[in-house]
């Protein structure tokens, strides 16, 4: 029997059907349903600090179940979430309807060929670009969707992601892409798309994990606490020294 061809876009479209009711429930209630809730809140909290306050518009590409879009809409932004999976969009719309008055809409579509019909202040890729079939097309589409001077934020897994056990499992079980997507590579894509400048930053969640540690709660000795805190600062400085390998990239149109 021939092995069917690998079609990651079909895998993305079928993903929410394959994960079952429990998986969809988990996706609906992110970030709070996820073991990495602290990571997500640290990253999105930093995003809110960096963005200009509402009213501003955001295009959330590869929004999945819509939790990032809804989070930003609850903070007052006008958000359009786009995902290739109609199941994901239905889930996002169902969740958004539970909070009347949100300025959020969801559209099914391919972010490699997005036609939003208007321009946005910000574009966000949150754990989404590394699933692309053609990441250059996706970044170029994001560029075209921005207003002059608009800003793209990308929180993506860095080097080595494609080799970890979770990524390999997702490829095997769901037939999706799980690519390495370090900020330095995203900048290569961005330059070709037309972005004029960039900033590499450590992922806020990485810095938080370095400095705010459970180890503090396990040993109340003052000397030990000071040592752990010092090591935490050193780890944070190490992360800050190499954000082009793994972290956040910001690019300006």
Whereabouts are the PLM-identified features?
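Conserved SAM-binding loop
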Residues: 92-93
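A short acidic, Gly/Pro-enriched loop at the edge of an enzyme's catalytic core
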Residues: 112-122
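A short glycine-rich, Lys/Arg-flanked "PGG" loop and its adjoining helix->strand segment in the class I
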Residues: 136-148
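Conserved SAM/SAH-binding beta-strand->alpha-helix loop
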Residues: 85-87
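Conserved class I S-adenosyl-L-methionine
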Residues: 1-53, 153-175
């Amino acid at each position: 029997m021939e092995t069917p061809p690998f079609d990651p876009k079909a895998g993305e479209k079928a993903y929410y059907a394959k994960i079952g009711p429990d998986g969809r429930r988990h996706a609906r209630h992110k970030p709070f349903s996820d073991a990495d809730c602290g990571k997500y809140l640290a990253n999105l909290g930093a995003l809110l600090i960096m963005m200009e306050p509402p009213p501003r518009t955001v295009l959330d590409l590869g929004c999945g179940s819509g939790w990032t879009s809804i989070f930003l809409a609850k903070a007052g932004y006008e958000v359009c979430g786009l995902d290739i999976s109609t199941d994901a969009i239905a889930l996002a719309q169902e969740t958004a309807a539970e909070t009347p008055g949100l300025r959020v809409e969801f559209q099914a579509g391919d972010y490699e060929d997005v036609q939003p019909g208007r321009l946005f202040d910000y574009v966000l890729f949150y754990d989404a670009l590394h699933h692309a079939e053609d990441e250059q097309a996706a970044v170029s589409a994001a560029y075209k969707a921005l207003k002059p001077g608009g800003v793209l934020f990308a929180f993506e897994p860095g080097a080595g992601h494609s080799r970890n056990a979770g990524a390999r499992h997702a490829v095997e079980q769901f037939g999706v892409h799980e690519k390495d997507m370090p900020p330095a590579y995203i900048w290569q894509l961005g330059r070709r798309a037309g972005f004029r400048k960039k900033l590499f930053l450590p992922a806020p969640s990485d810095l938080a994990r370095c400095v705010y540690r459970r180890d503090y709660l396990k040993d109340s000795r003052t000397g030990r606490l000071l040592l752990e805190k010092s090591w935490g600062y050193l780890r944070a400085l190490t992360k800050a020294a190499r954000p082009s390998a793994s972290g956040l990239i910001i690019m300006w149109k």
